[in-house]
């Protein structure tokens, strides 16, 4: 029984269309893999640069508290009572050192954590007279001789990285601590020059640095009861509401790279998400690159594959027609 003309046409077009779709799918997948691989290498290099600039900034000041802890004036002041005149001399000394070092603030704490002098003594947000014994960096300094802690300033409301070192008497007894605070506005402005999202999160997975304000103070992972209690006790992100950042992994490319779908104020968007641990400070640096350009590469590859397939089909039809004519 002979087939009808429409059916014959359908059976002819079916493998042609199937081949067209398969070639477009294959080309799209190959283009995606190549683009993700190339983008991943670029993202990792970019992230290494950001990590280097952040660590260089911190290392510039990491030794400052240890050096100041040896200052005889500071040691002598903490060893005895501090009157108004001595406190003013200490304030001016710290102000001068802070200006020369280009740190954000310097403060001198006694053995209870009370700020007896500070470089910002003449500002409304002065630390002088406030007790910081509850801050982890002070507790670490008592136990280990030095401490570090990123937090929002309780008085100033300005976030920063606190580095501290113990001030000790000649016999080694603990007298107090000298603390330097670092703020990172210049670093975030540098990050703003890229269209990518650049984030830094702490050990709890809370974003504390970001080149876009709406991404700061976001929870990358759910916080448990212990974490929330500790945050409240230390006032780490004092008066800053923490909101979850909803995201899901679409595909993993090793331990530190993945394709993720992230929900933000602009809606859902897919990112190539690269992470880099900073073990010295217990932080993780993240770079999120929009995959829109990758989608463009995929679409271009699919169109090229479709064009190639159709060209081969027409070439085949042409050769078939020539063969039929030659047989006549």
Functional labels for PLM-detected ranges:
Residues 230-303:
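Extracellular/periplasmic juxtamembrane segments that couple receptor/chemosensory ectodomains to their
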Residues 1-33, 37, 306-317:
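Extreme N-terminal signal-anchor transmembrane helix of membrane signaling/transducer proteins, especially
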Residues 88-100, 177-235:
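Solvent-exposed, extracytoplasmic
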Residues 291-328:
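Cytoplasm-proximal transmembrane signaling helix
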Residues 83-92, 121-152, 216-263:
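Extracytoplasmic/periplasmic sensor domains and loops in membrane signaling proteins
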Residues 76-77, 113-120, 207-211, 274-275:
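Amphipathic coiled-coil signal-relay and dimerization helices
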Residues 16-80, 103, 146:
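Juxtamembrane extracytoplasmic/periplasmic/luminal helical "stalk" adjacent to the first N-terminal
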Residues 99-100, 118-190:
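Extracytoplasmic/periplasmic ligand-binding sensor regions of membrane-associated signaling proteins
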